[in-house]
Amino acid sequence: MRFYQEDKKMSKEFPITISSWTLGDQCKFEDRVIAAKNAGYEGIGLRAETYVDALNEGLFDKDILAILDKHGMKVTEVEYIVQWAEEHRSYEQKYKEQLCFHMCELFDVKQINCGLMENYSVEYTAQKLRELCQRAGKYIIGVEPMPYSGIPDMKKGWAVVKAADCENAKLIMDTWHWVRANQPVDLSVIEDIPADKIVSKIGRA
């Protein structure tokens, strides 16, 4: 019984969330929420593009919140800011970034997941991350290392986050990408990273 209660407490503090990518992009917003609910999840991730799809259905913010409330679900993850290290960011990327900030405010989400496909030096990337963190203000910027990206592993990810030296710059540790980057299973890669700098630990089916 004690373990069950502890599990429920942990689940309440950190809702079990299904990624926006897992649910795909070819369904209506309410169908997405229902599918996640029926599968036993407590929260859904939402990409900026998926949020725009919901608006394109004719939904307003109040409608989206009503659907979530109707099914006892929450949006618990917002993503995905990219190309934030470009010297001259496009208006589309600037708008998407602002949209992610709005989504965090709307859904009371504290963190935005971010990736970077382009490969730059640690120093340059850290400077651009610092600028992103300043724009994000109160929101956490979760940097996600991916083996096919410009931040391919936790080693470079931590070097960038450490050099950026921002309180709201943190790392996402995704076991799916971890395995595909051939990182050691003994976790030696993260032994020098403070625990409070790893903001998410994600596993995938």
Regions found by a protein language model. Give the residues of each.
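Histidine/acidic-residue-rich catalytic or RNA/ligand-binding cores of hydrolases
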Residues: 153-154, 183-190
